[in-house]
């Protein structure tokens, strides 16, 4: 019966049936909205989520459909961030505000064009987010959305599956997370001459593109909430065997403020007015750990099996040289393609597959062709 309902519902609104995938149920969020009259709805992703796009459209849909419900909406979108950063900032930006009833997430585009993640990295990030949600807020109903950029759209048009989408899909299938394949729907509608890339608005959609996305979500939720009202909330499945043993399920930030400073390092606001490159407002007026002196080491200990840093990498970004436990050596060039004219936020990982336990790390700045500046907003621990 459900299959028939899905087909007729999707045919009615003209969407390709495989592009709106309902997995599991949305009974828990419905109970919070209809029975309790109070619900928390969080949106996580990059600039597509942060901007006034599909997110406020869905907020408006929920508020109008349920005027008696007191909604708390969380905008956890941060431009340029990928699923790796998402896994480490989830406790701060979302879970710190208490249980979440409905959670929307998108990282397909940024895992592709910003982070250029491998399949393993895409899985570590997305699975880490889903497992954290399932462990700390087990009744949360989740929807993932695949937005699209020109390269990914061309891949779909040629019958290929973009790497970030196929990687995320493995996670969504395993944890029975519902999915909106906006990218594939757009490709299909363009082929039918119902839409154009220009009308959609590009990687950061214009109102028509965001309306298409919001409509798909509204239809999914309307379908999920169409039966008799449930009375008992149930936790979602939480498999004990993850896809990746190195996923960031225990991802969290460690403030550099807790690190003992050594010569050459400061925990303060950089001298932004005298630094070349664009600066985003959210990162100003806040202290961070920084140095522009090469070969000045700083040391600290951490508990976990992964260590990295959430940094601002500008035109003068250098290279971090590191040593873990006195035996694992490496270096990471902080400079990114987007760093040429912007102090660009990105997460770099030093190690993700250590043995669980206490470790020590030493880091220092090594000059690169662009400069030798290191600016760390948070350390990333898993």
Where are each of the predicted segments found?
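Bacterial N-terminal signal peptides
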Residues: 1-11
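Surface beta-strand/loop "capping" patches
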Residues: 231-304
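Alpha-helical cap/lid subdomain in secreted, periplasmic
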Residues: 56-72, 81, 85-234, 254, ...
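Membrane/wall-proximal cationic-aromatic binding patches
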Residues: 15-43, 48, 62
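Catalytic nucleophile-elbow at a beta strand-turn-alpha helix junction centered on a G-D-S/GDSL motif
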Residues: 38-53, 78-82, 306, 315
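C-terminal interaction-tip segments
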Residues: 381-382
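Surface-exposed aromatic
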Residues: 75
